[in-house]
């Protein structure tokens, strides 16, 4: 029967029809991307606090700041929706921590231990704890959780030879901060993507595992006598920067967050067919999340971090995005903080480098909001 299905239309080219159909679908998707900023505003910010909606034309030098109480109360609804609808959750209860550790490195300034914690049956969290030496008895220090990027390991944040990380976890420990470098699952192409795809079938993602690991890590850190449990900050590069907007948005226990080498106009990063650094042109097929483009981009995730301090580190030569996209998305973050009179609690640093920890404005941001460790 298939042999009878011959094309007998004179001059008809099915390739032309295929191209029209494809370009029509692409045009529809790009029209949704173009309208996604407005869709996200209507979904979250303007719904949680209607006064944030732009008013009439103004020539006033200054506008009245808003009370954040209504926005903070209402935004808990979106925090829950973000975790349940975008990140995903598991029904299983977290296991007792059952911490195990071994000392693996020591310098004149600090000692480092590998630490392993139970999360779920068959699933463990692990990372590198770096304790400054000579912490006085009874002294409680702030912690900076230093998150590696894709295909990285915790030691990458310590070794000076890693140009992207520049030993930032060790450098912060030398300043007197306790640092902890967790291992995240995005290592071993493409095995972690298979895990993400399997989790999709039950409403989860790779970050369902990562968020659970961080909950266990925070619970354990707070048990340490040297740790100030109210001052645990997050600082991540690349996929660790992606973690820096997702995990603290869900877990309020992180007192501030720094996103390095990742802050983006995420919706365009995922769906733009022309941007050379976009996910349409990479092997990272786990990056699309269901309906995320009309719900949460980086500004909205930062809105879930608000009113905690939030900082962005952006290299001019970092190909994960463009300066223009980053500035566009960050402008929404600063406007949100400024609307509530808290613009001093957010910042961005552009530096003349690449996909790297710069450690200048970001370190000063940590000192400002955590205090100088040991003082």
Model regions and ranges:
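Alpha/beta-hydrolase-fold serine-hydrolase catalytic core, especially in secreted/extracellular enzymes
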Residues: 1-125, 280, 300, 306-375
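Glycine-rich active-site/cofactor-binding loop and its immediate structural neighborhood
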Residues: 102-161
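Cap/lid segment of the alpha/beta-hydrolase catalytic domain
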Residues: 136-223, 269-272
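Alpha/beta-hydrolase-fold catalytic nucleophile elbow
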Residues: 183, 235, 260-261, 313, ...
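Mobile cap/lid helix-loop segments that gate and shape the active-site cleft of serine hydrolases
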Residues: 209, 256-301, 307, 320-330, ...
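Alpha/beta-hydrolase fold nucleophile elbow
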Residues: 226-238
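Glycine-rich nucleophile elbow surrounding the catalytic serine of serine-hydrolase chemistry
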Residues: 236-246
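Conserved hydrolase catalytic core segment
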Residues: 249-255
């Amino acid at each position: 029967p298939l042999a009878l299905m011959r094309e007998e239309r004179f001059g008809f080219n099915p390739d032309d029809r295929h191209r029209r159909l494809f370009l029509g679908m692409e045009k529809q998707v790009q029209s949704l991307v173009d309208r996604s900023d407005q869709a996200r505003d209507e979904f979250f910010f303007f719904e949680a606090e209607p006064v944030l909606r732009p008013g009439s034309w103004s020539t006033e030098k200054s506008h009245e700041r808003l009370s954040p109480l209504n926005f903070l109360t209402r935004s808990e609804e979106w925090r829950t929706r973000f975790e349940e609808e975008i990140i995903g959750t598991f029904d299983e209860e977290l296991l007792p921590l059952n911490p195990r550790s071994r000392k693996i490195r020591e310098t004149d300034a600090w000692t480092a231990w590998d630490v392993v914690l139970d999360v779920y049956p068959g699933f463990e969290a692990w990372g590198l704890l770096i304790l400054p030496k000579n912490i006085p008895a009874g002294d409680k220090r702030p912690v900076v959780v230093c998150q590696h990027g894709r295909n990285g390991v915790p030691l990458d944040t310590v070794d000076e030879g890693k140009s992207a990380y520049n030993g930032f976890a060790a450098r912060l420990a030398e300043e007197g901060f306790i640092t902890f470098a967790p291992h995240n699952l995005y290592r071993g192409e493409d095995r972690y993507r298979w895990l993400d795809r399997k989790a999709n079938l039950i409403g989860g993602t790779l970050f369902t595992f990562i968020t659970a690991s961080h909950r266990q890590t925070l619970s354990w850190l707070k048990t340490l006598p040297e740790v100030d449990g109210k001052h645990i900050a997050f600082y991540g590069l690349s996929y660790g920067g992606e973690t820096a907007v997702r995990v603290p948005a869900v877990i309020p226990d992180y007192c501030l967050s720094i996103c390095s080498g990742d802050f983006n106009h995420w919706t365009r990063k995922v769906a733009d067919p022309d941007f050379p650094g976009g996910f349409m042109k990479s092997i990272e097929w786990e990056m699309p999340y269901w309906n995320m483009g009309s719900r949460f981009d980086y500004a909205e995730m930062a809105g879930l971090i608000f009113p905690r301090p939030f900082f962005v580190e952006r290299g001019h030569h970092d190909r994960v995005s463009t300066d223009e996209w980053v500035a566009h998305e960050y402008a929404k973050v600063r406007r949100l903080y400024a609307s509530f009179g808290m613009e001093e609690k957010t910042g961005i640093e552009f530096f003349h480098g690449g996909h790297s920890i710069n450690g200048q404005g970001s370190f000063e941001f940590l000192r400002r909001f955590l205090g100088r460790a040991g003082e």
